[in-house]
Amino acid sequence: MITELHGIDIRENEPLKHYTYTKVGGPADFLAFPRNHYELSRIVVYANKENMPWLVLGNASNLIVRDGGIRGFVIMFDKLNAVHLNGYTLEAEAGANLIETTKIAKFHSLTGFEFACGIPGSIGGAVFMNAGAYGGEISHIFLSAKVLTSSGEIKTISARDMAFGYRHSAIQETGDIVISAKFALKPGNYDTISQEMNRLNHLRQLKQPLEFPSCGSVFKRPPGHFAGQLIMEANLKGHRIGGVEVSEKHAGFMINVADGTAKDYEDLIAYVIETVENHSGVRLEPEVRIIGENL
């Protein structure tokens, strides 16, 4: 127990595999669940004072945590999940579930968020990665975000300052942490929005191995190609290392089929990159983030 942080939900030596979509990941020295911005600021100020590293994990959907875990503080925003509407502007805290947020927009007949109706993860992670699918992406509706700087200061960043690109935002370089974001939606028809979301979710269920733990899409789309197609053409569907294999359903996904480890994921990613490059001359670039220490 850290007496200076009394009252905050903090768990020591907590295995992160219980919180990641891949079901892999070693322990965090301290796993914290702040309930508000004040508790979040207390954690960051304390960690900085004690020279302890800290990071925000988000919903850990497009992420692999190594088997040795993470030193210092890991902060999860599960309890920072409020969503508010002000006219056609939707504001969501970073821990709000992305899929549930799209349902709130639909309930109020607001259009613009349909593309994200099947993307797992949090609002904060979606902004960080400029998440997208089926022709839409976060940058298309983003207005602004409140972020926490490494010093514990809270400031607002505009869409222009985010420098959005394909699976990229400026905060990937600055280290700022999204704590809430505002999005510009438009009035729409409930039935039309609902039908579009049902269509996209049906496509996702047909094409993606949602029944297995995974980190989502592993690789960025190479210019002029599709990663899954290149992997399939290199005869890598079903290729397995340890407990992790390239999905037979969608070669762009790697699934945990038998108590796989982060090392299994990393080894398989490296093997796929090498094999695809040898076969097609295209070098795939991972979209998934890999963090933490090896065993």
Curated annotation (Swiss-Prot):
Name the GO terms of the biological process aspect: cell division; cell wall organization; peptidoglycan biosynthetic process; regulation of cell shape
**Cellular localisation:** Cytoplasm
Q: Which reaction does it catalyse?
A: UDP-N-acetyl-alpha-D-muramate + NADP(+) = UDP-N-acetyl-3-O-(1-carboxyvinyl)-alpha-D-glucosamine + NADPH + H(+)
Q: Which residues form the signal peptide?
A: none
Active-site residues are 167, 217 (proton donor), 287
Write out the GO cellular component annotations.
cytosol
One Pfam family, short name please?
A: FAD_binding_4
Q: What is its main location?
A: cytoplasm
InterPro entries per record: FAD-bd_PCMH (IPR016166), FAD-bd_PCMH-like_sf (IPR036318), FAD-bd_PCMH_sub1 (IPR016167), FAD-bd_PCMH_sub2 (IPR016169), MurB (IPR003170), MurB_C (IPR011601), MurB_C_sf (IPR036635), Oxid_FAD_bind_N (IPR006094)
Q: Where is the FAD-binding PCMH-type domain?
A: 23-188
Record-linked SUPFAM superfamilies? FAD-binding/transporter-associated domain-like (SSF56176), Uridine diphospho-N-Acetylenolpyruvylglucosamine reductase, MurB, C-terminal domain (SSF56194)
For this UniProt record, give its keywords in alphabetical order, as a comma-separated list.
Answer: Cell cycle, Cell division, Cell shape, Cell wall biogenesis/degradation, Cytoplasm, FAD, Flavoprotein, NADP, Oxidoreductase, Peptidoglycan synthesis
Q: Which GO terms describe its molecular function?
A: FAD binding; UDP-N-acetylmuramate dehydrogenase activity
Q: Which domain of life is it from?
A: Bacteria
Which cofactor names does the annotation list?
Answer: FAD
**Enzyme nomenclature, EC number:** 1.3.1.98
Which pathway does it take part in? Answer: Cell wall biogenesis; peptidoglycan biosynthesis
Q: Which family does it belong to?
A: Belongs to the MurB family.
What this chain does, per the entry, is described as: Cell wall formation.
| The name this protein goes by in its record | UDP-N-acetylenolpyruvoylglucosamine reductase
- The gene from which this protein is expressed is murB
